Structure formats: structure tokens, C-alpha cells
Amino acid sequence: MTVSHRNDQKLISAKELARLSDVSYAAINNYTDMGLLDVVARRRRLRLYDEAVAKERLMMIVRLISEGYTLRIINKIVRGDGHAQNL
């Protein structure tokens, strides 16, 4: 489910984000619960993400995982507690 939002922001559900990014729905939910992905709106029981921001963030998460970083370290990088500018 893709929805238009203010400022031409396209919102996307976790299910659709998983389908488009080839990342499992469970992983999307886990990353959200950890604070790696930001929910920008809610519609009933759906958590909606900014499509462009979420896709970019997921690409970074997948890349960092493939480079051997743990989710704990990735969380620090995403939150600005790490050295993201050097990655």
C-alpha cells in the first residue's frame, strides 16, 4: 500500500517495503522496533514509512550487515553515535 502524504512524501507499508526491497517483513518489523526505520504515520494498524527514506535506510542496513556489522553497531551508526561519515 503506497499512500500520498503531505509535501509529496510517498508513504509505504511494511509489507510493500518488504516486497520492493527484498527484505523480509519480519526484518522490517525488527528494524522498526529497534529504531532503525522511522514510522512517519499510522493508518489503523498499518505503520507507514517515507518510501524514499526507508528504501535508502534499508540499503544502508543491508550493506552494513553484508560488511559484518552487527545490528547493535548499525543502530549506533544510524542514530549518529558511530562513525557513519566514514562508511
Language-model features and meaning:
Residues 1-19, 25, 29, 33-34, ...:
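Arg/Lys-rich, alpha-helical DNA-contact motif
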